[in-house]
Amino acid sequence: MSDMRLIVAGAGGRMGRALIRAITESAGATIVGALEAPTSKWLGEDAGTLAGLPANGVKLSADLWALSADADGILDFTVPAATLANVAIAAQRGLVHVIGTTGLSASDDAVIKSVTNQAVVVKSGNMSLGVNLLAALVKQVAKSLDDNFDIEIVEMHHKAKVDAPSGTALLLGEAAAWGRGIDLNAHSARGRDGVTGARRAGDIGFASLRGGTVTGDHTVIFAGPYERIELTHKAEDRMIFANGALKAALWARGRAPGLYSMADVLGLGNAST
């Protein structure tokens, strides 16, 4: 099979540059497009040079329709508004759409789901193998422990991250909720401050820390009577997300239309969300 021809959305950002490197260093894929916002200062720049690699002749552009004429897929780690705009074009063009954008609302998710009867979409709050295995463990632990074990999720990211809790924290929260057989939206505790009263039984708590250059640390705490279990993942380089996204795109090529997750890509069944 020929190399999969991929577009990187948000090519000028940290994740975009990591994705360019991952594709360039891979076997089985090639970069044919680099997408940026119409106001980006990187428009017209060479994608390879921008990623710290030799020039590859792919110039950053704001025109996804033109870029997608000869593409097979798009890797999208941008912002919700950009992802929603990309979804429509990717579906029309028949592109595999790998979405790692975080901060998406329920209505955003509904828009994405609406195209999956005609398009292949792989969407996850985290594309790394380690986090998705962690989610599988969280499901099993939450299912196995009695409900007198309180669940708290602590995450830390670099100071430039704009959404909280992180997409990964929410993924882990969904995994814990699945294990408990509850709806996360109805049992989510965020932003505790002041006199909050006693902890509500059954809640899944979230705490978000921001500072420095932290790529991503996540800990799921199961706090029970006189004992505590902590499951932790620490991301040391964005390349783990980029390589995971590339793996997802290659896996999704030729699949039937639908909405897939990294659990599907990694063969974990329903072990993560």
Curated annotation (Swiss-Prot):
User: What top-level class of enzyme does the UniProt entry assign?
Assistant: oxidoreductase
List of residues binding (S)-2,3,4,5-tetrahydrodipicolinate: H158, G167, T168
CDD domains, per the entry: DHDPR_N
Q: Principal place where this protein is found?
A: cytoplasm
> Mind listing the UniProt keywords for this protein, alphabetically?
Amino-acid biosynthesis, Cytoplasm, Diaminopimelate biosynthesis, Lysine biosynthesis, NAD, NADP, Oxidoreductase
Q: Which SUPFAM superfamilies match?
A: Glyceraldehyde-3-phosphate dehydrogenase-like, C-terminal domain, NAD(P)-binding Rossmann-fold domains
Under the heading HAMAP family, the entry gives: DapB
Biological function: Catalyzes the conversion of 4-hydroxy-tetrahydrodipicolinate (HTPA) to tetrahydrodipicolinate.
Question: Which NCBIfam families does the record match to this protein?
Answer: dapB (TIGR00036)
Which named protein is this?
A: 4-hydroxy-tetrahydrodipicolinate reductase
Q: Which organism was this protein described from?
A: Rhodopseudomonas palustris (strain BisA53)
